[in-house]
Amino acid sequence: MEERYPLTIPDSLLEKMNAQMLLRSQVETVVRTAEETGTMVLDEAQGIYYGHGRFGSVTIWAAWRRTDAGPELCNVYSHRVVVKEVL
């Protein structure tokens, strides 16, 4: 069994994830991958990092803060839009 990534998720966001049918493991993967690869954006004024990942037809965006205890989720959202280049 894979060890859970130490991402703190407030109950309100767990409820939001459940309503949007987003898996905790997918959100953890977004944050872990962004942290490991550096593919994230930092809002310096707020101290919030943003990263995203694609899971099938769904793109999940996560916003988190770094804390002494590890990352803490601030927001999460998703979309099912695919942008294709038209020539």
Model-based region annotation:
Residues 1-87:
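Ribonuclease/tRNase effector modules and their secretory precursors
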